[in-house]
């Protein structure tokens, strides 16, 4: 019943309902069985209309290759689809897209590896309150390019928000004087 209501809402112009229709199709909720191709079509409809959550969900389908290599909408390349839709959602400040886009840039998965772009998107998400992105920004600065002051700042912010991994990093590395004394209180 819920799917039919969401589908009716889409027909009446509620583009946000495309997210719910896509979810129902992807999971099979309210339907006889899941239908990933139908889910992708609903997400694409919302994505093309500028719905950030639909853009993000469509990118996730490309990443997960849930439809198989040959079944992408219009024969689209999953690598191109992933980056395209994640960027569109991230540019609308959709925090989950910012985090995932940064992950993909850092890993070089589905997108050409670009550490500067990863840092940009992690910091953007972190500045919106993402504790995950705060930790990840610290991790990137701790590894490549090495900047212990920035790493310490991001780890500290993540630790202040309750991220246990960031607390552990700060505790373990204070003894090497890699971070400034500001973080001594965390010992």
Language-model-derived ranges and their functions:
Residues 148-164, 171:
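TPR/TPR-like (Sel1-like) alpha-helical repeat modules
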Residues 164-187:
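Terminal, low-structured helical/coil segments at or just beyond the last alpha-helical repeat
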Residues 11-15, 27-29, 48-51, 65-66, ...:
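Short helix-capping/linker turns of helical repeat alpha-solenoids
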Residues 18-27, 57-71, 100-107, 111, ...:
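Hydrophobic face of amphipathic alpha-helices that form TPR/SEL1-like repeat modules
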């Amino acid at each position: 019943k819920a799917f039919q209501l969401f589908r009716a809402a889409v027909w009446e112009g509620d583009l946000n309902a495309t997210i719910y229709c896509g979810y129902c199709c992807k999971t099979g909720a309210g339907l006889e069985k899941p239908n990933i191709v139908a889910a992708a079509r609903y997400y694409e409809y919302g994505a093309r209309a500028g719905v950030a959550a639909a853009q993000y969900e469509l990118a996730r389908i490309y990443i997960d290759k849930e439809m198989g290599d040959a079944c992408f909408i219009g024969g689209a390349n999953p690598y191109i689809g992933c980056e395209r839709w994640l960027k569109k959602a991230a540019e609308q400040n959709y925090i989950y897209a910012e985090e995932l886009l940064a992950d993909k840039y850092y890993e070089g998965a589905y997108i050409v590896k670009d550490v500067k772009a990863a840092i940009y998107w992690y910091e953007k998400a972190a500045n919106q309150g993402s504790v995950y992105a705060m930790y990840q920004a610290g991790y990137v600065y701790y590894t490549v390019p090495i900047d212990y002051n920035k790493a310490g700042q991001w780890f500290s912010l993540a630790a202040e928000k309750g991220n246990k991994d960031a607390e552990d990093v700060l505790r373990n590395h204070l003894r090497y004087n890699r971070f400034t004394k500001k973080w001594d209180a965390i010992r």
